[in-house]
Regions:
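C-terminal domain-closing interface element
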Residues: 183, 188-190, 345-393, 399
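Short, hinge-like loop/turn segments at secondary-structure boundaries
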Residues: 338-341, 368-369, 428-432
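Short, surface-exposed secondary-structure edge patches
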Residues: 112, 269-271, 290, 339-343
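Protease-associated
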Residues: 212-295, 358-363, 375, 379-383, ...
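Short alpha-helix capping/helix-loop boundary micro-motifs
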Residues: 165, 334-340
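Nucleotide/phosphate-binding sheet-loop regions of phosphoryl- and nucleotidyl-transfer enzymes
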Residues: 1-240, 276-279, 286-288, 297, ...
Length: 480
């Protein structure tokens, strides 16, 4: 196959030659010249002439779709979405509808509900005299779908009717592509639309209220992986739409955080005590950083993966964390780092998304998590129909109290070594680990026993009679 990049180079050269910036500004003669260049490039790369028989071209296109099932991107997508490899793919062969044959033509992409908020109503974009690729590629600025009504009133009225028919049939929010050719509407495809976690909850509840889904079906519509993000602060959906990530790491602990950059745990603690919201930026974290990690709104590390110290501790504390952003060039001594060609100093504002791993310049407003509204309704329905009890991992009285508030019916695992991460306790714990004699070890144990006894008592009180499974000390030595 010939990669798309070879043809893009030829298109860019032609646009530069003609002094235009958009593909649609090229004339028919320009496109004919480009077609000859494309054929020459194809022969250069493949070694044979480009086939001119339409049937041969069609079969080549079909085979290309089948081959795409094995490309790296498809394999990653299947793995992330639990799609079996054995399914294979299908090819639809259909007559073409042209949206680029003049000003009475156009193309668009639309959702029957807002995929960010879940609000009912048409949401999408439309372009006149264009093909579908132009809408999603960003080469031209599209119009809001509502503006289609002024340009093509009859097609728009028909489109609204079709949207309702499709949503009523599939009983879910639809993501549709369509073309208008000389004023006539052609529907190209529809599918259940992707949506944010918040939108998923609203859509599921609204479909129940509209009589299209049962409560049990609404619960089944929610991807459980999305719920984790809803238990942490989130970026305001409207503000997030306007923001562009400047970097990306691993989404190690969900939630959203924004604040002023600090580079040491001590600074994080000191700034937080003054009422400042801070994001702790480190090459990597260690147990000595625990007080600063607790004081910070979020944690960003250059090194480390999903099981690094920063990731594990942040998840345990419910703190937003992005780890392993190797694009950051860090200078800890001078308290500065470089990302996306810009220098960031102590005190500069930054925002991080622990669910996606995205990093943003500046402050993006956040909204707190709560089991209320649609989230509360969905969880109430889940409780109504579930057959399993749910327990949680909790290692401290604070964790247990929060878990109980969020509906946990006990603790499935309490990792007792996590009780000793605090600065006031970790020294005694290290004494116990490093003791050379039994006497020294028992002396250290005498120091830590009151901490543990107090925590156990507080754990039991927080759980109000619910069960707890205690794991005796099992400390990974590198964490202490």
């Amino acid at each position: 196959e010939v990669g798309k990049k070879y043809f893009e180079v030829l298109i860019d050269e032609m646009k530069n030659k003609k002094g235009v910036t958009q593909d649609v500004e090229l004339t028919a003669e320009d496109l004919q010249e480009l077609a000859e260049q494309f054929k020459a490039e194809y022969k250069k790369q493949i070694g044979v002439d480009f086939p001119t028989d339409p049937k041969e071209q069609l079969m080549g296109a079909i085979e290309a779709v089948f081959r795409s099932w094995d490309n790296p991107r498809a394999n990653v997508y299947r793995r992330d979405n639990d799609i079996p490899y054995s399914w294979g793919t299908a090819v639809n062969v259909q007559a073409m509808a042209f949206g680029n044959m003049g000003d009475d033509c156009g193309t668009g992409v639309a959702f029957t509900r807002d995929p960010s908020t879940g609000a009912k109503g048409l949401f999408g974009e439309f372009l006149t005299n264009a093909q579908g690729e132009d809408v999603v590629a960003g080469v031209r600025t599209p119009m809001h779908i509502s503006e289609m009504e002024q340009k093509f009133p009859e097609a728009f009225a028909q489109f609204k009717t079709v949207c309702k028919t499709l949503e009523d049939h599939y009983r879910d929010m639809q993501d549709m592509e369509f073309t208008v050719e000389h004023g006539k509407l052609y529907m190209l495809q529809t599918r259940n639309g992707k949506r944010t976690a918040q939108a998923a909850l609203k859509i599921a509840c609204d479909l129940v209220d509209e009589g299209m889904r049962t409560e049990e079906e609404a619960v089944a519509m929610i991807d459980p992986r999305n719920l984790d993000t809803l238990l942490h602060p989130q970026f305001d959906a409207t503000a997030l739409k306007a923001a562009t990530p400047m970097g990306k790491g691993l989404g190690a602990s969900p939630g959203a955080a924004c604040g002023k950059i600090v580079f040491t745990a001590d600074d994080a603690t000191a700034w937080a005590e003054k009422g400042e919201k801070v994001v702790l930026v480190r090459l990597e974290t260690s147990p000595e950083d625990i007080t600063g990690m607790k004081a910070a709104e979020g944690i960003l590390t250059v090194r480390g993966g999903m099981t690094s110290h920063a990731a594990v501790v942040a998840r345990g504390m419910g703190t937003c964390c992005v780890s392993g952003c190797s694009d950051i060039n860090m200078d800890e001594d001078n308290k500065v780092f470089t990302l996306a060609g810009k220098e960031f100093h102590e005190g500069d504002p930054i925002s991080i998304d622990g669910s996606t791993g995205n990093i943003y310049d500046g402050i993006i407003p956040t909204v707190p998590a709560s089991i209320a509204g649609e989230f509360g309704r969905i969880m109430t329905w889940a409780d109504k129909y579930r057959t399993l009890k749910v327990r949680t991992n909790a290692d401290t009285p604070e964790d247990a109290k929060r878990a109980k508030e969020l509906g946990a019916e006990g603790i499935g695992l309490c990792r007792t070594e996590h009780m000793f991460f605090e600065e006031s306790r970790i020294a005694a714990f290290r004494e116990m680990i490093c003791a050379d004699t039994v006497e020294e070890r028992e002396k250290a144990l005498d120091k830590i026993m009151p901490y543990q006894q107090g925590d156990f008592e507080a754990l039991y009180e927080a759980l109000e009679g619910n069960p707890v499974t205690i794991r005796f000390l099992d400390p990974p030595l590198h964490e202490f």
